[in-house]
Amino acid sequence: MKNLTAMGGLIAASRLPVLADDPTLFPRRGRWERLVLAYHHIEAGATKPFSLLHISDTHFTEAYAHEDPRRLKLKEIRTQTFGGRQEEALRDSLDWARQNVDFVLHTGDLIDWQSQANFDLVKKYFGDTLFGALGNHEYSRYMWLEKEGKNEAYKEETRAWVSSAYPFDLSVASKVVNGVNFVTMDDVYGYVTPQQVERFRAEVRKGLPIILCLHVPLYTPGIWRAKNKFWRLNGQKFTSAAVPDPAGDYQVQVSDPVTRDFIAYLKTEKQLKAILAGHLHITVQERFSPTAVQYVVGGNFLFHGQEITFS
């Protein structure tokens, strides 16, 4: 496990720091009441059983006083949006993981927008051990205060800054744990590129079972229905089981030829054993293919996570 961490593998829980609790925050809170956890087991063909804590969407909202006024404005607004307890949520998650699982995986939106303070928080908690997937907010400079390109050119403008805090290949990364290949891909705007597809196929050629780790879930009818109910129909009661027409990221996935073909291929790939994703801020799962279920985890800013055991 030490070697995995040194190589930048999945975050080894045994190497996580012992984090002091803040007695002023819920001083009588119990050890079992800190997190909202879902539990899943994946029969992936591991050479030895292991477990991980999967978290996503922490959404740090910090900015130093000397930073851009727009970032200071975002700090004020977005800290209220997320409740101001994101760092506590991550600290509790990592402390629980250190005692209960082997590894930690984060699937994006660890930060809410780009600021030096946010990137410093990433480094504070993970250093050079972080492994996972990026989210769309990792590339957001000023959120709605400027127009985001949502393409490779836009990401390239700040890729070096992002890379300084996220010590893994931002496009496609792979780490093998007990014979199971965890492959992360950048799909933060819904699409994947031909280069990413080829690199994924190279991972398949290794012949190992694969856990695909993404930020934006891949389109399935049930997950899209759940996302639509939570985000677009807030305040409305359920009236129809009809699957809503694709929009946003999902429209990209069903209309972009490369991405559409990649998803179709994945449904036939027998080495794919599961997909782990976030982005939606809700916990939901659905069978993706004959060999794989897609597990979406709720927002870590609300103390959500899921423990996944592998055999």
Residue spans for each PLM region:
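Acidic/histidine-rich helix-loop elements
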Residues: 56-88, 140-165, 222, 247, ...
